[in-house]
Amino acid sequence: MPIGVPKVPFRSPGEEDASWVDVYNRLYRERLLFLGQEVDSEISNQLIGLMVYLSIEDETKDLYLFINSPGGWVIPGVAIYDTMQFVRPDVHTICMGLAASMGSFILVGGEITKRLAFPHARVMIHQPASSFYEAQTGEFVLEAEELLKLRETLTRVYVQRTGKPLWVVSEDMERDVFMSATEAQAYGIVDLVAVE
């Protein structure tokens, strides 16, 4: 049996015969996007490209971003967040499984009132971490300064989009804070919890 991405039939408007396309391309046509892995430059660029293309194609139809991600790199995650704010269509964010670290940052970036978590989803927030533990002292100081700026940026976004006071978000980001779907709703990261 072949292994790979499943194919599904798709008929373009005005065509008689359907062609077989991979399931993700079919879902993209319905404006359904998926972040189902660690956030890195590759997936970030793919999602940014899709959001820009789909918003040019039709700026009146909303986009739906499904998230099941353990987090990942800060800059590619912030790039996804910024694109979500930039495109004209509203971007709904849907947490299924886990939205941790940058995954939760992207989740909170959905259009306010259009952020959803599945009932058994988990959300985790924390401060950004450095990957340069073995850097020279001078490099480490520069890295620490940049890390503090990024932490401040992420904290401000959480404060703005959750309505929580700055001191609460700052304190919570000091460590890994895991939340259930209903706890994430109470915190303001999502607006709705899907019913079972």
From Swiss-Prot:
Any idea which UniProt keywords this protein has?
Chloroplast, Hydrolase, Plastid, Protease, Serine protease
The cross-references to SUPFAM superfamilies, in alphabetical order and at most eight, read:
ClpP/crotonase
Signal peptide bounds: none
Predominant location category: plastid
Known EC number(s)?
3.4.21.92
The record's annotation in Pfam families points to: CLP_protease
Name where it's found. Plastid, Chloroplast stroma
Q: Kindly give the InterPro entries that the UniProt entry links to this protein.
A: ClpP, ClpP/crotonase-like_dom_sf, ClpP/TepA, ClpP_His_AS, ClpP_Ser_AS
Q: What class of enzyme is it?
A: hydrolase
Q: Which cysteines are joined by disulfide bonds?
A: none
**Entry GO terms, CC:** chloroplast stroma; endopeptidase Clp complex
Q: Which residues form the active site?
A: S101 (nucleophile), H126
Q: Domain of life, per the record?
A: Eukaryota
Q: Name one GO molecular function term.
A: ATP-dependent peptidase activity
Catalytic reactions on record: Hydrolysis of proteins to small peptides in the presence of ATP and magnesium. alpha-casein is the usual test substrate. In the absence of ATP, only oligopeptides shorter than five residues are hydrolyzed (such as succinyl-Leu-Tyr-|-NHMec, and Leu-Tyr-Leu-|-Tyr-Trp, in which cleavage of the -Tyr-|-Leu- and -Tyr-|-Trp bonds also occurs)
Q: Which GO terms describe its biological process?
A: protein quality control for misfolded or incompletely synthesized proteins
In the record, the note on similarity to other proteins reads:
Belongs to the peptidase S14 family.
Q: Which HAMAP family match?
A: ClpP
Subunit notes for this chain? Component of the chloroplastic Clp protease core complex.
Main function: Cleaves peptides in various proteins in a process that requires ATP hydrolysis. Has a chymotrypsin-like activity. Plays a major role in the degradation of misfolded proteins.
Listed name of the protein: ATP-dependent Clp protease proteolytic subunit
